[in-house]
């Protein structure tokens, strides 16, 4: 038993004080003595040896607060002494360096012949490479930060109520801005006097059809004989598009009706309800002198999109142009 324990100490017998070896029965065979005669004495001697060796082993592992490296016994089991793999494969591992736990009490190291103390079955922190220790610290810090993020501060009932009220205010403001935008869009689309206000979907459909209609009017080239000059205004004023164009294209004018009507009975629109919207018109003074000239114009006819039997906007745009003979 004593020979196996001394294999763990590089200094061998020099490590122990000389007073320990002065006892007569240190190297004697204890099995030759009769345990019935001196059983109490044998038990006391064995306990004293275990305590002394545990104290010496602990002092050797942590001398002056520094962890000293111990080489494992050759007869130790590989699975008991194999340290867990730490660090990258390219870094050297000190697989044979072990030390005792600093917090282990004296005499707390169980021992059996043929196996090292249990404190030697764990690798010492001092033998790890600097890169491995740094990665371990970084991993611990990252785990602590993640745990702190997962822990959410418990809000009080007053704070929750305040957050709900702020969210409701933001939602009301958002809906109010959307409603204001649709009201502005409805004011620019020529519509019939509906009994109820158009929904958002119907307003968007009318706006799409009306925008396509105006785009076709602006981009269409209607050849007219001669260079026309133009323009007739309306009650609400007019806006010119493109100015005088070369060739036979006449000047196009978009008239913005603001719903004002002349009170004069001679007005052809006298008595009709005001219709806000736009119209496109042009005039050619040279063609006014000629007879039997057919002039065409595409007319925008707003319809109620809520009617099931109403025409689609594609059909409205594809209607044949309005014709009249001057």
UniProtKB/Swiss-Prot annotation:
Subunit structure: Component of the pancreas transcription factor 1 complex (PTF1) which is composed of TCF3/p75, TCF12/p64 and PTF1A/p48. TCF3 is responsible for the nuclear import of the p48/p64 complex. Interacts with TCF3 and RBPSUH/RBP-Jkappa.
MF (Gene Ontology): chromatin binding; DNA binding; DNA-binding transcription activator activity, RNA polymerase II-specific; DNA-binding transcription factor activity; DNA-binding transcription factor activity, RNA polymerase II-specific; E-box binding; protein dimerization activity; RNA polymerase II cis-regulatory region sequence-specific DNA binding
Stated name of the protein: Pancreas transcription factor 1 subunit alpha
Single GO BP term: hindbrain development
Tissue distribution: Exocrine pancreas-specific. Expressed in azaserine-induced pancreatic tumors (at protein level). Expressed in AR42J cells but not in ARIP, DSL6A, or DSL6B cells. Down-regulation is associated with the change of an azaserine-induced acinar cell carcinoma to a ductal phenotype.
The entry's keywords: Cytoplasm, Developmental protein, Differentiation, DNA-binding, Neurogenesis, Nucleus, Transcription, Transcription regulation
Gene designation per UniProt: Ptf1a
Annotated Gene Ontology cellular component terms: cytoplasm; nucleus; transcription regulator complex
Region of interest: Disordered: 229-249, 304-326
Top-level taxon in the UniProt lineage: Eukaryota
UniProt-listed Pfam families: HLH (PF00010)
Cell location: Nucleus; Cytoplasm
Gene3D superfamilies xref list: Helix-loop-helix DNA-binding domain (4.10.280.10)
Naturally occurring in which organism (per UniProt): Rattus norvegicus
Function: Transcription factor implicated in the cell fate determination in various organs. Binds to the E-box consensus sequence 5'-CANNTG-3'. Plays a role in early and late pancreas development and differentiation. Important for determining whether cells allocated to the pancreatic buds continue towards pancreatic organogenesis or revert back to duodenal fates. May be involved in the maintenance of exocrine pancreas-specific gene expression including ELA1 and amylase. Required for the formation of pancreatic acinar and ductal cells. Plays an important role in cerebellar development.
Domain bHLH span(s) in chain numbering: 162-214
PROSITE patterns recorded: BHLH
Compositionally skewed regions (Gly residues) per UniProt: 229-240
């Amino acid at each position: 038993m004593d020979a196996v324990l001394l294999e763990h100490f590089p200094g061998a017998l020099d490590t122990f004080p000389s007073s320990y070896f002065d006892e007569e029965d240190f190297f004697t065979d204890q099995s030759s003595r009769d345990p019935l005669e001196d059983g109490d004495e044998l038990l006391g001697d064995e306990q004293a040896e275990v305590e002394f060796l545990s104290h010496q082993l602990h002092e050797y592992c942590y001398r002056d607060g520094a962890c000293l490296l111990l080489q494992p016994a050759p007869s130790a089991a590989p699975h008991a002494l194999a340290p867990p793999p730490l660090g990258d494969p390219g870094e050297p591992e000190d697989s044979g360096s072990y030390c005792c736990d600093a917090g282990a009490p004296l005499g707390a190291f169980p021992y059996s012949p043929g196996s090292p103390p249990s404190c030697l079955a764990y690798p010492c922190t001092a033998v790890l490479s600097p890169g491995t220790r740094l990665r371990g610290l970084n991993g611990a810090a990252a785990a602590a930060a993640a745990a702190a993020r997962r822990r959410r501060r418990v809000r009080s009932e007053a704070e929750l109520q305040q957050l709900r009220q702020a969210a409701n205010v933001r939602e009301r403001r958002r809906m109010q801005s959307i409603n204001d935008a649709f009201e502005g869009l409805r004011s620019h689309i020529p519509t019939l006097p509906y009994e109820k206000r158009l929904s958002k979907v119907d307003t968007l459909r009318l706006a799409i059809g009306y925008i396509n209609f105006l785009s076709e009017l602006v981009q269409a080239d209607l050849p007219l004989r001669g260079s026309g000059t133009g323009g007739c205004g309306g009650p609400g004023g007019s806006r010119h598009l493109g100015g005088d164009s070369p060739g036979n294209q006449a000047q196009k004018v978009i008239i913005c009706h603001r719903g004002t009507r002349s009170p004069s009975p001679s007005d052809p629109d006298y008595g009709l309800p005001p219709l806000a919207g736009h119209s496109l018109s042009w005039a050619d003074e040279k063609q006014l002198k000629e007879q039997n000239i057919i002039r065409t114009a595409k007319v925008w006819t707003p319809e109620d999109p809520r009617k099931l039997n109403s025409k689609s906007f594609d059909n409205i745009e594809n209607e044949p142009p309005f014709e009249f003979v001057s």
